Curated annotation (Swiss-Prot):
Disulfide bonds: none
pot1-binding: annotated segments: 2-223
Annotated spans, Disordered: 159-178, 235-269, 282-358
Record's compositionally biased regions (Basic and acidic residues): 348-358
Lineage: Eukaryota, Fungi, Dikarya, Ascomycota, Taphrinomycotina
Swiss-Prot/TrEMBL GO biological process terms: protein localization to chromosome, telomeric region; telomere capping; telomere maintenance; telomere maintenance via telomerase; telomere-telomerase complex assembly
GO molecular function, one term: telomeric DNA binding
Name of protein: Protection of telomeres protein tpz1
Pfam families from the UniProt entry: TPP1
Keywords associated with the record: Chromosome, DNA-binding, Nucleus, Telomere
Amino acid sequence: MSNCLKHPWLENGLLNLIKNADVLPIRVFKCQPLQIFEYIRYEHPIRCKLSDTEFYIEAEFSSQSISDLNNFTEKRITSLRGGIVTLGNFLIHLIPSQSGIIPWIQVESFNFQGCEGAVFGNPKAITTSALFNALLQSPYLAALANEFNRSIKEGSSYQEASLSQQEKPNDNTSNSRDIKNNIQFHWKNMTSLSIEECIIPKGQQLILEKESEENTTHGIYLEERKMAQGLHNSVSETPEVKQEDNDEDLDAYSWSSSTDSAGEIPSLPTNRKILEKIAEKPPPFESPLEDDETPDQTNEHEANQVNVSQLPLNPRGSGISGRPVESTEQLNSSLTIERSQSIQSTDSKQRVETQSHRRSKIEIFDAQDELFDRSICTTIDDSTGKLLNAEETPIKTGDLHSTSASSVISCTPPAINFTSDICNEQIELEYKRKPIPDYDFMKGLETTLQELYVEHQSKKRRLELFQLTNNHQKNSEACEMCRLGLPHGSFFELLRDWKKIEEFRNKS
């Protein structure tokens, strides 16, 4: 069994583990053998010294590890002095003291190997190692150990305060609250919290329920008040409508809510019967023209329609004059006379203005493969809706295109005879392509196929002639080789060619 402790590992193993520590305690799983050197405490928790024949460290056995040992053997753990155990899971603790940091381990699982009796080697305390002692003097490890021990003390005091509060719920809990507020929790000791520490006291629950009820009732009251205020504002902002007494035969139009002044707004004191008859007639855009009607007749239709905008206005600017009207025929006749006078004056002005702005369209057909006569059709757009037909003048063109390529106009059109009314007008030319007359698509397809067939046959003849000449030359060479009694074939031809190349190189 002494061979199990042949290689001491305690110093180097603990150095590497503690050097890279960032939290306490350090949890380790390492199957390494150690010997129970000496017992320090025989009662629970049982403490002893474990050595690797060179150094020893204080250890504490957990209750779970002791129960596992009792299931394995009937021996008590305190009777195993000098026995060899193999560690499984264990925790490394660092305790700050006046002399420095003291390390110890807490064994959670181990396997008993046997060999109770003598102690191997002369082990010393792990703190006597120069390397290990230098590591324990690190301020980082000191701060880490102080923080861990302070958190343990604060957690224990908080547990005592919570237990006393549960035993006396009716007493004043101000002292326990002060203790709770002064405690500084760290993330490392959050695992030590119990369920009782997370429960909210009954007094605090009542306070929270009252605050939530007050907030909800206050919020509902504010919403109802806002809705009532909004309804009151909407009712107060509605404009007041004026009620005016009017006659039975007249329709009154009131603009009491308008921002315009009374002098700028026209009134309509016309007779109701006249307005009803005017409304029965269809508007101009709803009376379609017949096919036989001319543009002159359309102007007559427009002149006969009653337009309210053309009614005579009062010189004072108060709208339509309130003169008496006997019948609708008299009203229509007066309106048509005024309408005709205004149309005549506007027509004379428009003719003078549009004389320089008239434009004529000339449509010219483009030339194709055949020679044919072209005709020029001119149309003049008049602003009043009248159409002027220009004289059609035949134009004879020469040979514009010698081939069937894409036609391009390369000459200017000849002089055109227009009437005296449009002699000074601007001329706009529009060229349109005229389709080719009497063109047979199938005939064109047959000619194209015939040309392709002729070209294919010529290529075929040339290829056959080339093959015949080549074969004749090869046959003549083979016959000559046979006549001379020389070997012939592809291999011998290649050999002969290489010999010719070699002779040529030697000569050069």
